[in-house]
């Protein structure tokens, strides 16, 4: 099959690369190309395969976390480091079709469509790592432990499915852990991010009072997608939110603590909950002059947290039950995420550029491996 990869032109012969393209991601040149991948062998008689399945990736998408991995791989290739590989695959969300099953697999069948189950932090099987299932969804073929995928319903299309797992599992966990009351006022920061979008849509489905904070202009269609949430725009790089009339909230969801934590804390009510699942500057090249990452307000922040009995919660992905719940609540008429663009394998640069360089992007960019 044809698969998209970051390619090392110093190590991979030109004849092995089709549709070579270059794009810039925050100052790093990333070279993408299409390579041939053969179906891996899978011996169902081998006991080592008993609890595993072989999956053909039908479509995949990238998350913010993949950006740093892509940039790091490209930097290694560009600097000709000895540890650089000929190709580097990427992508952590996918939908795939099971093509082979091991003898010990009972709940999954050949032909089933599945998505990754990134359960964390609790182990479900000895020797099977928790957390993100793969960083190489673009490889096209994946051999995975049976616990690391879940089947999806027919009414979830491939494009939503390829964008679903990490955002849905993370948002489901964050909402569960905040013990939200029906009267709580909720703020979601960086609201165009994929995780924030999942959070907003899930909260609205339950009837909560949601305010979404953004630094971008939204179209009417985009505002309609999150209605009746109140969308408030602030200037990008604003050092303090004191000059805007935000008010107070009982719960604040924030995907980027290094950008927003210091400004969030003063806007929490007594016994308020702040929860975060990540940070923006996962690589030094991601840092911008307008980022407010001051540490000299830390003492004031902790004083406010102590005086007001605040809860500061860190969240990493979620449990299997969190993902099962998100799948069970999925409504094709009210999807939790928009699909911004769908491209095929021969549009690798467009896929990466749209995913990471377009501030106007609203939702996920999906690459399909289906004809």
Question: Which functions belong to the PLM regions below?
Answer:
Residues 206-208, 259-336, 368-371:
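Glycine-rich phosphate-binding loop and adjacent beta-alpha segment
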Residues 115, 252-253:
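N-terminal Rossmann-like NAD(P) cofactor-binding module of classical short-chain dehydrogenase/reductase
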Residues 162-238:
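Mid-domain Rossmann-like dinucleotide-binding core that forms the NAD(H)/NADP(H) cofactor-binding site
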Residues 237-247:
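Short amphipathic alpha-helix with an adjacent loop that forms part of the alpha/beta core around
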Residues 43-61, 74-123:
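Glycine-rich beta-strand-centered segment in the early N-terminal region that forms part
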Residues 173, 319-371:
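C-terminal hydrophobic helical "lid"/dimerization subdomain
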